[in-house]
């Protein structure tokens, strides 16, 4: 049997009793998962990003069970994913490392040139950032796997997005879901946008990652695995940044 204990990054106190019980800390009650009957030298399990895990082993055979091993600490890093080139609109150019989206200046297209990222598991907190290069109109957000590829991001009940569109005097950030919208106007155009998909807290947040400021927060009980989604409406490029630890401004949001 191999118990697996999870610990939050901000977990501050712990105590083990009889090898199977862990007390509640000031912040979070840790939980255990056990895997019995492991017959191969390896076992694959899904772990949440930005979490500390304690692994314990105990051997079992017809003659009895061994003592539980000492804890092995494994700390996971931030969510990492790539763009799915097969989902890209023909007008978009996707880099060989599947992290850069480009819409050429003279590209001719109909509809909304979009592309999806790899599917994120429906648990934990996922954070990524987008660096904007000379693109004045774009959409970034998430959509459930069941979302129709022909639909427009943010105009149905299975997608949520931030739509950046310039005006004569400012930049308008429009937050869309099922076609309903909320507008935020800013005088500067952030070149780095952060997105936090928080399944645990039921939130989707968009940040000005340069200044560490929340642009918009959506409260919703997200239930399904989701694709990060991107659409360019004007020429330019978006670069995807993943695998990072949660910035302090995200932890405190």
What is the role of each PLM region?
Residues 1-253:
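Beta-rich ligand-recognition domains in immune and ubiquitin systems
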């Amino acid at each position: 049997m191999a118990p697996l204990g999870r610990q939050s990054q901000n977990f501050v106190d712990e105590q083990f009793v009889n090898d199977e019980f862990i007390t509640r800390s000031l912040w979070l009650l840790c939980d255990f998962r056990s895997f019995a009957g492991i017959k191969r030298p390896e076992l694959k399990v899904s772990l949440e990003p930005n979490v500390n895990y304690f692994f314990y082993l105990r051997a079992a055979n017809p003659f009895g069970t061994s003592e539980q091993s000492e804890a092995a600490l494994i700390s996971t890093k931030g969510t990492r994913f790539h763009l799915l080139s097969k989902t890209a609109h023909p007008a978009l150019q996707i880099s060989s490392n599947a992290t850069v989206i480009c819409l050429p200046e003279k590209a001719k297209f109909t509809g909304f040139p979009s592309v999806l990222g790899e599917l994120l598991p429906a648990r934990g907190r996922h954070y990524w950032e987008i660096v904007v290069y000379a693109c004045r109109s774009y959409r970034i957000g998430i959509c459930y796997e069941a979302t129709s590829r022909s639909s427009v991001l943010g105009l149905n009940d299975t997608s949520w997005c931030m739509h950046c569109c310039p005006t004569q005097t400012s930049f308008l950030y429009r937050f869309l879901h099922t076609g309903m919208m909320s507008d935020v106007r800013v005088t500067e155009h952030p070149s780095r946008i952060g997105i936090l998909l928080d399944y645990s807290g039921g939130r989707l947040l968009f940040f000005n990652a340069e200044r560490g400021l929340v642009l918009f927060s959506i409260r919703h009980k997200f239930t399904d695995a989701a694709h990060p989604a991107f659409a360019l409406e004007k020429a330019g490029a978006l670069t995807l940044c993943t695998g990072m630890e949660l910035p302090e401004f995200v932890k405190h949001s």
